[in-house]
Amino acid sequence: MVTGAARGIGRGIAERLVGDGYAVVITDVEGGAVARTAEEIGAVAGLEQDVREAASHQRVAAEALRHGPLRAWFNNAGVGWDGDLGELEEEQVRGLVEINLLGVLWGMRAALASFDQAGGDIVNTASLSGLGPVPGLSVYAATKAAVVSVTMSVAIEAPRGVGVHAVLPDGVATPMVAQMKDTGLAKALVSSGGRLLTVEEIAAAAVELMGSRRVLRTVPAWRGAAMRASAMAPSLASGAMGLFAAQGRRAVRR
């Protein structure tokens, strides 16, 4: 099961799983797009789903179980509207929280209820922004911090044989990043790592978590360490953010 898989990271994860021989069910809020993607990559089903609705996860879980035992559930659906807290519309704030966080929680619950005695893996798409301050992406980062937190907690709660993981990428070359405001602070910070990561890199990192004892995987590792350091002294992080932003703006101009 892969949510948010019509394009971007979700599609990349699904393509890799199909290539590895899995029967893959993919979902997306855009029904036509996910149906086309399913046909193009060889997924067994492409279903329209609004991850904000708890019942939708039970419905797609039932469809997945029609094709065999459930072995992995990837909670990937998400949105990334950028802007300071005071700039975002109320609908955007609500959407960020409901899609990025509630969508993951409902998906995790459905997966846990659907695994058989052989167990399985839950892999959540989080973000490096969930590890420290990211001005210009404050609400998005808050939702991803919550995903990191619940991943670590449920990894302990989960029954034996069930692995719970999250992949935390830096900026990735996806439509989500492309739609960010070119002059905004968020776009600059997301682009400050030297280059945007590829969908294929993150898909590989996510799929490799299946069967692993690792709970969190940051990509790249050095940026994860930098974000954790900024979280330890947020009052001192503004200077570093300025340097990262300047580097990112140069990258965006290129």
Regions found by a protein language model. Give the residues of each.
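Active-site-adjacent segment of SDR/Rossmann-fold oxidoreductases
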Residues: 20, 132, 153-163
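Residue(s) in the substrate-gating loop at a strand-loop-helix junction
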Residues: 127
